[in-house]
Swiss-Prot record:
Keywords: Calcium, Cell inner membrane, Cell membrane, Chlorophyll, Chromophore, Electron transport, Herbicide resistance, Iron, Magnesium, Manganese, Membrane, Metal-binding, Oxidoreductase, Photosynthesis, Photosystem II, Transmembrane, Transmembrane helix, Transport
Chain positions recorded as Fe cation binding sites: 215, 272
Cofactor note: The D1/D2 heterodimer binds P680, chlorophylls that are the primary electron donor of PSII, and subsequent electron acceptors. It shares a non-heme iron and each subunit binds pheophytin, quinone, additional chlorophylls, carotenoids and lipids. D1 provides most of the ligands for the Mn4-Ca-O5 cluster of the oxygen-evolving complex (OEC). There is also a Cl(-1) ion associated with D1 and D2, which is required for oxygen evolution. The PSII complex binds additional chlorophylls, carotenoids and specific lipids.
GO biological process per UniProt: photosynthetic electron transport in photosystem II; response to herbicide
Membrane topology (UniProt): Multi-pass membrane protein
Protein known as: Photosystem II protein D1 2
Function field: Photosystem II (PSII) is a light-driven water:plastoquinone oxidoreductase that uses light energy to abstract electrons from H(2)O, generating O(2) and a proton gradient subsequently used for ATP formation. It consists of a core antenna complex that captures photons, and an electron transfer chain that converts photonic excitation into a charge separation. The D1/D2 (PsbA/PsbD) reaction center heterodimer binds P680, the primary electron donor of PSII as well as several subsequent electron acceptors.
Sites where the protein binds chlorophyll a ChlzD1: 118
Quaternary structure note: PSII is composed of 1 copy each of membrane proteins PsbA, PsbB, PsbC, PsbD, PsbE, PsbF, PsbH, PsbI, PsbJ, PsbK, PsbL, PsbM, PsbT, PsbX, Psb30/Ycf12, peripheral proteins PsbO, CyanoQ (PsbQ), PsbU, PsbV and a large number of cofactors. It forms dimeric complexes.
Positions with a binding annotation for [CaMn4O5] cluster: 170, 189, 332-333, 342, 344
Catalytic activity: 2 a plastoquinone + 4 hnu + 2 H2O = 2 a plastoquinol + O2
Residues reported to bind pheophytin a: 126
Subcellular location: Cell inner membrane
Amino acid sequence: MATILRRRSLGNPWEQFANWITSTDNRFYIGWFGVLMVPTLLSATICFVVAFIAAPPVDMDGIREPISGSLLYGNNIITGAVIPSSNAIGLHFYPIWEAASMDEWLYNGGPYQLVVFHFLIGIFAYLGREWEFSYRLGLRPWICVAYSAPVAAATAVFLIYPMGQGSFSDGMSLGISGTFNFMFIFQAEHNILNHPLHMFGVAGVFGGSLFAAMHGSLVTSSLIKATSYEESQNYGYKFGQEEETYNIVAAHGYFGRLIFQYASFTNSRSLHFFLAAWPVIGIWLTSLGICVMGFNLNGFNFNASITDNQGRTIYTWADIVNRANLGIEVMHERNAHNFPLDLAGTESAPVAFAAALGDG
């Protein structure tokens, strides 16, 4: 009997490329969204690393007072950052070819726009890639929906908020201390701590942490014993096994009696949906809060909200926080805001009791 071997037709190069890109057998799934994601995230990462190490000072406020952000200009890992593009640039698109020279581009903070725009395109593509990979594997699409929460947060602080404020110099710096600086100034200008949407975000993050810790500890405490005392309990689970690895009835019984019956889930699917939805919705809402505050729909104002029978203000913690906000406003952008109107136009508000001054 004769055996005939024939080389399988692989089609044209485009088909080979398309099959490789969309193959779920690759160690690293690329996908069509990955074709966009890989170069943009690589560009953002390379520019960020180079700028963090070696970028010269940037005139962020547009008043000829450059701010140093790189390691070679005296910073460390904590203080270093990629400084936002100059207020003189505003919302203008500022690629390298728009500047008269590389020195001008660096002085005006061009690397910030390069990093941020490529990063945003990259994480949008990563979200699409999550959907694409789920689709090809026959999974439901909720992984990319969950990832949309941090994507919304990044979009809010790097794109929507600066657009609302009129300049990319108001965007968040790409560094540790720069992030804190952004938070302080945001509080001073928008009173974010008194904004309901931020409160939802706090509940989402803290609540999500609490629920994750509760769920993990309950499951770990109610594992079905499948090993001896000499082995780790983790060896009692075999990847892909059909049997449940923990006793949900025992976990429900414990938690239902620890709190009350209806605080404990009896359905594993609804439990895990809740664990995903709580932090995601919270971060969605706080991202929405950043966006609306970008257009100056600020937090609640309870300043001087309590008065005595003669109309004099009885100071509350809201007034103390307001004084801190005003102090932060005075300190940042000093040459641009020497005397904020809300400081110069009102009488001073004492923030200490008379006893603290030594009376009596």
